[in-house]
Amino acid sequence: MEIKVIKEEQNYLELQIDGEEHTIGNLLKGMLLKVPGVKFAAYSLPHPLITSITIKILTDGSISAREALIKAIELAENYANLFIDEVKKI
């Protein structure tokens, strides 16, 4: 996995993630939309034969786009840990 910043402003971040496809794209988009202050989050897979996605994040300015991404990743980690705990109970 390699992450490249395509464009960054205070409330906007566009990243290219090489070596990843829909799995991480859907996860990040879903978690980003749960972060307060995020107005828009989306990802695209430019071509099905290329394993690279582009993620776009736009916030209302109350949080930076980079901070929103970090919070979304932390949220995903919390969900994963909760899921692990529930599976262990089975």
Swiss-Prot record:
It comes from the Archaea. Its EC number is 2.7.7.6. GO terms for biological process: DNA-templated transcription. Part of the 13-subunit RNA polymerase complex. PANTHER family: DNA-DIRECTED RNA POLYMERASE I,II,III, DNA-DIRECTED RNA POLYMERASES I AND III SUBUNIT RPAC2. It comes from Sulfolobus acidocaldarius (strain ATCC 33909 / DSM 639 / JCM 8929 / NBRC 15157 / NCIMB 11770). This is DNA-directed RNA polymerase subunit Rpo11. It catalyses: RNA(n) + a ribonucleoside 5'-triphosphate = RNA(n+1) + diphosphate. Gene3D superfamilies: RNA polymerase, RBP11-like subunit (3.30.1360.10). PROSITE patterns: RNA_POL_L_13KD. HAMAP family: RNApol_arch_Rpo11. Belongs to the archaeal Rpo11/eukaryotic RPB11/RPC19 RNA polymerase subunit family. The keyword Acetylation does not apply. InterPro entries: RBP11-like, RBP11-like_dimer, RNA_pol_Rpb11_13-16kDa_CS, Rpo11-like. Keywords: Cytoplasm, DNA-directed RNA polymerase, Nucleotidyltransferase, Transcription, Transferase. DNA-dependent RNA polymerase (RNAP) catalyzes the transcription of DNA into RNA using the four ribonucleoside triphosphates as substrates. GO terms for cellular component: cytoplasm; DNA-directed RNA polymerase complex. Its main location: cytoplasm. It is found in: Cytoplasm. GO terms for molecular function: DNA binding; DNA-directed RNA polymerase activity; protein dimerization activity.
